[in-house]
Amino acid sequence: DVRVNENIALTSLHALFVREHNRLARALRVLNPTWSSETLYQEARKIVGAFNQILVINEYLPHIVGPDAYNRHLGQYPGYDENVDPTIANVFATAAFRFAHLAIQPIIFRLDENYQNQPQFPSVPLFEAFFSPWRVIFEGGIDPLLRGLIGRPAKLNTQDHMLVNALREKLFAFTSHIALDLAALNMQRSRDHGIP
């Protein structure tokens, strides 16, 4: 999926999950030496998927909806139920989930081990981070980027500044002949899916 390189922060998160998958597969091979490589791959994939769900449900979602709404609508995890449909609604995937675009910072922060600005590889304007995986390889790796994601808050939305300019006026301009507008793309996607 080419979107892994959409921006270097996203690239660093994907690399983290791939590394964890591979670490788990190696550990599972020691515990289950008769498993095929396909079984090792799939079992590690399931565990990483579960990690991701735990992070989203327990760490991310309470900050998004607030503790009262979280407890009222989700509450304690009742355990796996094979009768629950795991799919998401088209309206959520197409429209509602796009709300996270509003929390994207105009800067991709790279921080040192003390969570301070990285002097050797400074933070990067978002529009210069689109489809530039070489920045990860040649400019300090994923650790400074992951520290930037952890150590700096998401952008706070204000009524007059919802979506940063890099997403409205410079989307992919650094690597493309023309810039795109993410808000316009989101609206068009909704129209394509028949969302009012």
What are the residue ranges of the model-derived segments?
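Long, well-ordered alpha/beta core segments of mature domains
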Residues: 1-196
